[in-house]
Amino acid sequence: MRETIASNNKALVLAAFDTLFNTRDYAAAERFWSPHDVQHSAHIEPGRDGLLNLIKGLPPTLKYEPGTIVAEGDFVIVHGRFSGFGLPVNWIAADMLRIENGRLVVHWDVIQDEATRASSKSGLPMFGDTFRA
């Protein structure tokens, strides 16, 4: 049973992120987020509308690539890459979300610029197995 809940919650987050960030279907995206979504992100205004308005203001070239995703109970954490949003560097993000009644209700994130091969002290990429060109 716990595996089913975790799998369903991971699938919900992946579908929500793809619908909002990649497909940019705002009407469909609304069904994934509570209208009263609590945002702990420094980049997003309160509520679902704050998130939708932020994305509407970004270039249509915005893309999100999910990486590792972990779920425990009502929480999902996904490590991903945002690109094409108008800055010269990509962002690597760890997003943590709480799910209630099949909707995303709370969001936290940690975001940083993606390191290049030249700037990586470890010599390892921050996302995936290879550095982006």
Regions found by a protein language model. Name each.
Residues 1-133:
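C-terminal and inter-domain tail/linker signature
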